[in-house]
Structure formats: C-alpha cells, structure tokens
A protein has these predicted regions:
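Conserved N-terminal phosphate-binding loop of PLP-dependent enzymes in the Aspartate aminotransferase
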Residues: 1-189
C-alpha cells in the first residue's frame, strides 16, 4: 500500500523525462555523489553496462582529443565482467560470454588480475586506459591487492593512461565505504 501511494504521488508530480531536462531530485543526487566521491561531475545511466560503455567511450574520446586516433586500447582483466553490450562484452575477460558474439570490438587487452608485470607488458603506444573491478565477482570472488592498485595508479600516471574502476557491484556502500576504491587510498580517473 505504501509503495502504491508513493508511486501515485510521484506520478502526479513527474513520472519520467530525459536527462536533458533539469530535474531537482536528480540534481540533489548528483550533488551527493560528488560530495562522497573524487568527482565533480555525474553522468546518470540506466544500467551497469551503460555506465561501463560510457567509461570506454569517454576514455577513447579523451585520448583521441589529446593524442589523436592512435591511442584506443584498454587493458582489462581476465575473469572480469563489465556488461552485455558489444563493447562491454568485448571488455569482459571471460571467453564464455564472447561465444556467439564474435567478432568482438578490437582494442581490449586481457591481463591476469593482480599481475603487475602482465599490465606493464601490455602497455604500448596504443594504450589509453586500464579498466578493472576492484573485487571481481562474476568469475569468482577475487579481491585486488592494495599494492597492485597503487601500482596501477602509478603506471597510469606515468604513461598518461586513465584508470577506470567498474564499481557496479562494489559501489554505494557495499564494501563498508561509499565506494570500494576508498579502501585503496587512491582515486580513479
């Protein structure tokens, strides 16, 4: 009964409109997200796949604007899961999810999770970003080592790569902090 009343009340105010319009509750949510994170901008999405798709596009766009067309590759991790769009499937490091969807998008290099040497060996003049989950949960539960994450931040800074954390499963307080990256004492891009 309470849910029906709340839905009815909201539907009488505003049911749904595009993100292109000013929506006061959305502005308040954006302010709260900025207050509790490293960022000063928010991009609202409808799903984790859409959020990761946007991260991939933004990384490539940033690199294209800064370095032109040559830097588009993103280093991702084996056993990862980033979504079911064609780009996020391509970024997913589990071959079972690739079946039936090949050819996938080019530009993703898979590295063993928590293996700094593998990441270093994968960086080349085409690399624009490193993308990973801090806790992998679809391919088994694997937690990133703190020194590994700090090392990734250092490498990303050294090579001017973006460091992207997929926090779809770990954000919003699910690990005891608002975002999981806060446990690692670093900030993503």
């Amino acid at each position: 009964k309470n849910v029906i009343e709340a839905l009815t009340q909201q539907a009488q105010k505003l049911f749904h409109i595009s993100n292109l319009f000013y929506i006061e509750p959305q502005i308040k949510a954006a302010e709260l997200l900025c207050e509790h994170s490293f960022g000063d901008k928010v991009f609202f999405c409808n799903s984790g796949a859409e959020a990761n798709e946007a991260a991939i596009k933004l990384a490539r766009r940033y690199s294209w604007k800064k370095y032109n067309e040559g830097r588009y590759e993103i280093i991702v991790m084996e056993n990862s899961f980033h979504g079911r769009t064609i780009a996020t499937l391509s970024a997913t490091g589990q071959p079972k999810f690739h079946e039936g969807f090949k050819p996938l998008l080019e530009g993703f290099k898979y590295c063993k999770f928590n293996d700094m040497d593998a990441v270093k060996e994968s960086i080349n003049n085409k690399t624009c970003a490193i993308m990973l989950e801090l806790i992998q949960s679809e391919g088994g539960v694997y937690v990133a080592d703190k020194e590994y994450i700090k090392g990734l931040r250092k490498i990303a800074d050294e090579y001017d790569l973006l460091l992207i954390f997929d926090e779809i499963q770990t954000g919003m307080g699910r690990t005891g902090k608002f975002f999981c990256y806060e446990h690692f004492d670093i900030e993503p891009d």
